């Protein structure tokens, strides 16, 4: 059964289609969008080996002229050098303004493909076909694209909404356990910031650390409710003028930890899990949140097999310094997303270095 979620925007609205066994229908889906005939399919070697032929065959059967390119996997390759390679391929294949880049992969592939599409010829079409849980519920939706700078995550980027997002839940069966767990961090995030019912459903599941232990109906809820939450928030605030900032819950400390470990030690979702633990405890210490609710959140993070402690030996002062490079800094103050109850958060710039240090020293 196909679920369709609409992302309603003033500029360009689009659909998120959640449909099992839909990868071989990608060509048909794109044909209905009235795009130009030239397509560049961007993936990584592992994903392309699993799904590349199916996607290319489907696109060609629908009449598209398809070129494909695989970028190395991993956050440390999310750089301007990789974008330059995509520009070279776009030039070789004479991509035009009516052409489309299709991102077939996880968050890194989606972010880079989106940024390349946003900047090639001042903007061409992009379609997101996420293959990880994290990308399905978060990064493929909303138009945030970009690459990392040596001093910070996603400091170089642009807003560029996709024309379409296609999610095939069956792809999750090929996902390594660690990648699945990383995606669960973003799912838990939605429960904390927006959807208390989703949070409750996650609590009722005995396990969240592996797909095979989660009931199919909960997997459906994880995908549809998470995508709906993201669509609701983005629909109200496309370019993070206010409300959309709540989607950064757990990401403030999380991004700093990723940067300090050179994007090698932790998956993005693992760092976000640590960041949610930190933000939750800061909220408790500021008397914004109940300790009991923070404990419920942390129990879910642990149940998903995610870390709740900082990596051993990580420099706390280094984290605090890295926070000053966070994209959400305004007038020199770090803006934190902090929960006030399950399903509700607030954004504040009143978190001091001492507040952060006190919590991190206990982690």
Curated annotation (Swiss-Prot):
One of its GO terms (molecular function) is metal ion binding. It is found in: Cytoplasm. It catalyses: 7-phospho-2-dehydro-3-deoxy-D-arabino-heptonate = 3-dehydroquinate + phosphate. Coiled coil: none annotated. Binds 1 divalent metal cation per subunit. Can use either Co(2+) or Zn(2+). One of its GO terms (cellular component) is cytoplasm. It comes from the Bacteria. Keywords: Amino-acid biosynthesis, Aromatic amino acid biosynthesis, Cobalt, Cytoplasm, Lyase, Metal-binding, NAD, Nucleotide-binding, Zinc. Its EC number is 4.2.3.4. NAD(+) binds at residues 107-111, 131-132, 144, 153. GO terms for biological process: amino acid biosynthetic process; aromatic amino acid family biosynthetic process; chorismate biosynthetic process. Its cofactor is NAD(+); Co(2+); Zn(2+). The keyword Isomerase does not apply. Gene3D superfamilies: 3.40.50.1970, Dehydroquinate synthase-like - alpha domain. It is an enzyme of class 4 (lyase). Catalyzes the conversion of 3-deoxy-D-arabino-heptulosonate 7-phosphate (DAHP) to dehydroquinate (DHQ). Belongs to the sugar phosphate cyclases superfamily. Dehydroquinate synthase family. This is 3-dehydroquinate synthase. It comes from Nostoc sp. (strain PCC 7120 / SAG 25.82 / UTEX 2576).
């Amino acid at each position: 059964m196909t679920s369709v979620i609409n992302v309603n925007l003033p500029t360009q609205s689009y659909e998120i289609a959640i449909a099992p066994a839909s990868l071989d229908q990608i060509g048909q889906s794109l044909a209905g969008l009235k795009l130009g005939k030239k397509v560049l399919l961007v993936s990584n070697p592992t994903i392309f080996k699993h799904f590349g032929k199916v996607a290319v065959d489907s696109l060609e059967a629908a009449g598209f002229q398809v070129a494909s390119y695989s970028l190395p996997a991993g956050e440390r390759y999310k750089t301007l050098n990789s974008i330059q390679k995509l520009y070279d391929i776009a030039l070789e294949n004479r991509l035009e303004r009516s052409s489309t880049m299709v991102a077939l992969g996880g968050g890194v592939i989606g972010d880079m493909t989106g940024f390349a599409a946003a900047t090639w010829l001042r903007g061409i079409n992009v379609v997101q076909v996420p293959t990880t849980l994290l990308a399905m519920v978060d990064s493929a939706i909303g138009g945030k694209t970009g690459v990392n700078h040596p001093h910070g995550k996603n400091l170089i980027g642009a807003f560029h909404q996709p024309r379409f997002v296609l999610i095939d839940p069956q792809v999750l069966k090929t996902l390594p356990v660690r990648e699945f767990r990383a995606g669960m961090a973003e799912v838990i995030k939605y429960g904390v910031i927006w959807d208390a019912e989703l949070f409750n459903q996650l609590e009722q599941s005995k396990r969240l650390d592996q797909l095979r232990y989660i009931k199919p109906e909960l997997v459906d809820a994880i995908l549809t409710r998470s995508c709906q939450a993201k669509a609701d928030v983005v629909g109200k605030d496309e370019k993070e003028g206010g409300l959309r900032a709540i989607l950064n819950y757990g990401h403030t400390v999380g991004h700093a930890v990723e940067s300090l470990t050179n994007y090698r030690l932790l998956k993005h979702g693992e760092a976000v899990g640590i960041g949610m633990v930190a933000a939750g405890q800061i909220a408790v210490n500021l008397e914004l949140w109940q300790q009991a609710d923070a404990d419920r959140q942390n129990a879910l993070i642990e149940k998903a097999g995610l870390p709740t402690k900082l990596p051993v030996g990580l420099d706390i002062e280094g984290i605090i310094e890295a926070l000053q490079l966070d994209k959400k800094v305004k007038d020199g103050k770090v803006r934190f997303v902090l929960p006030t109850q399950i399903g509700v958060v607030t954004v504040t710039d009143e978190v001091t270095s001492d507040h952060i240090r006190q919590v991190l020293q206990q982690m």
